[in-house]
């Protein structure tokens, strides 16, 4: 099958187009013919080797982290899906590879595609949808009347998270450029802060939760806008000890993670708030719940551009510019 592959870690080594063996179907797998795949900043980070200590992939590695397609075959223990079903999925972190014509995904990571969406629209959802769901619903437990700040509202995670937070009944603030303020309001943001002109930490206070997609100084400054007992959830790092524990990390890696996150965890305690790192996991049941919200028109996909499969490298480069409004998708068939 045709695929886009990483042979060696590093930006300069890039991603090559090539032929790879068809995936092996395990007894609890669903074999999916991929029609479209989402393109995410995570793809570039994996290519560059940023996660090689935490996610020790065997190279060559097919890149790509979410998809929509049609079930071709199912393993002997699969009960929820059958050939011909239109599905969408985020594969488990150790079995990625959606920039390809076929993929085998464990049944519990798959859900029926929202009926109201095209394949390209559906492929834009899994990674960002699960990230927002696990941050706001699972970890954050956002409730009606709470105040939430979502950084980088015009990005893939941001455009989904704004809509989800609004659906949950929160007052939603976000940071974005003035050019994207209109889109942010359309998606449900109550407060839009122009990050080029205004300091969000001077504008906001008493937030119950901040979802940070930026890391660095933005992460640290976010502590200032939280009320006592508030939650800072970061998806750009640094990883925390709980994450290392979930990953089954070695003693050395656990120690390194504890050191890397010491400063932000200490600062959070000083502000009487909590910090946690989120590395989204595959979850077909949550994708099923997300599909219901989409079919009820509570959430809509936001897609910037769709690239043809042969232009996957260009799609990755476009995502790396940071200028995409919403998601970038590759159309495979």
Describe the function of each predicted region.
Residues 1-26, 33-37, 44-68, 73-74, ...:
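Terminal helix/beta-alpha structural elements that buttress the NAD(P)+-binding lobe
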């Amino acid at each position: 099958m045709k695929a886009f592959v990483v042979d060696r870690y590093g930006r300069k080594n890039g991603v090559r187009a090539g032929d790879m063996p068809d995936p092996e179907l395990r007894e609890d797998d669903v074999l999916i013919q991929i029609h479209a795949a989402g393109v995410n900043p995570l793809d570039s980070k994996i290519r560059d080797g940023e996660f090689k200590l935490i996610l020790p992939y065997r190279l060559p590695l097919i890149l790509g982290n979410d998809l929509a397609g049609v079930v071709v075959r199912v393993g002997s223990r699969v009960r929820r899906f059958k050939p011909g079903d239109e599905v969408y999925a985020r594969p488990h972190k150790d079995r990625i590879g959606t920039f390809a014509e076929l993929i085998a995904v464990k049944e519990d990571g798959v859900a029926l595609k929202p009926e109201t969406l095209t394949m390209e629209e559906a492929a834009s959802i899994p990674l960002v949808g699960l990230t927002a769901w696990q941050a706001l619903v699972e970890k954050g437990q956002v409730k009606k009347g709470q105040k939430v700040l979502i950084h980088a509202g015009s990005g893939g995670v941001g455009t989904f998270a704004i809509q989800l937070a609004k659906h949950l009944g929160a007052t939603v603030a976000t940071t974005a450029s003035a050019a994207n303020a209109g889109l942010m309001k359309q998606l449900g943001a109550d407060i839009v802060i122009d990050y080029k002109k205004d300091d969000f930490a001077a504008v906001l206070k008493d937030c119950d939760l901040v979802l940070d997609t930026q890391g660095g100084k933005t992460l640290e400054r976010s502590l200032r806008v939280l009320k006592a007992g508030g939650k800072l959830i970061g998806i750009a790092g640094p990883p925390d000890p709980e994450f290392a524990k979930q990953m089954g990390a070695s003693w050395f890696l656990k120690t390194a993670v504890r050191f890397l996150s010491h400063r932000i965890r200490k600062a959070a305690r000083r502000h009487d708030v909590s910090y946690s790192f989120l590395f989204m996991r595959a979850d077909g049941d949550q994708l099923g719940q997300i599909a219901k919200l989409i079919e009820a028109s509570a959430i809509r996909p936001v897609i910037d551009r769709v690239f043809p499969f042969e232009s996957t490298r260009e799609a990755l480069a476009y995502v790396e510019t940071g200028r995409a409004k919403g998601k970038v998708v590759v159309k495979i068939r």
